[in-house]
Amino acid sequence: MFLFENVRGLLTHDHGKTYATMLDIFAKAGYTIDKQVLNAWEHGVPQKRERLITIGIRNDLVGKTEYTFPKAHSYKPVLRDVLLDCPEGPGVPYGEKKKKIFELVPPGGYWRDIDPKIAKEYMKSCWDMEGGRTGILRRMSLDEPSLTVLTSPSQKQTERCHPLEARPFTVRENARCQTFPDDWEFCGNVSAQYKQVGNAVPVNLAYDIAKEIVHSLDILEANTKIKEAI
């Protein structure tokens, strides 16, 4: 078996041709494929993060085992569950001007929730864009999950301001949003640590997927023993 994880956009990249090419390669390599888009928020992760999960089972094992995608949890965590007692960690502050503007944005709000004159001056050329503006001056809410944790804490079109303070999330806060344990160590400078966290698969989502892989292998082992006994 194999597991392949990627962003949901892979399904539509180049009008679907990229993923179709990959599926063709997997088929020629002798694998039967199953796929599903999973949202980490439904698997114990306080973050909206959709990922395409592709499972491959070798053709000669089809019929001897199967893979079932994990079911959604009954409780979906929010930022209140992970931020209020989060240990301190390295981070990157906003400049003084951006900090003062973010102080005007309410939790759960974004650029439309402040004085249009201030928003327009901040957004500059982005003000006239037809789309791609919902991430500008975006502030998280304790009562909602985080948006997708990214590799950089303060890009203008993908901002994620802390709900209680006018600053980006720290590395450790992002790690909590990815459900890393607090004793997990990240390496390198602050920028490198942000990238490690942002590129990771959320721990709780990975665990749910892996449990089902173990179950599939247990089924295969049991069927193999039965065949040998016969």
Model-identified regions with their sequence ranges:
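S-adenosyl-L-methionine-dependent DNA methyltransferase catalytic core
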Residues: I25-K28, R51-Q196, A200-I230
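Conserved Class I SAM-dependent methyltransferase catalytic core
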Residues: M1-K48, I53-I57
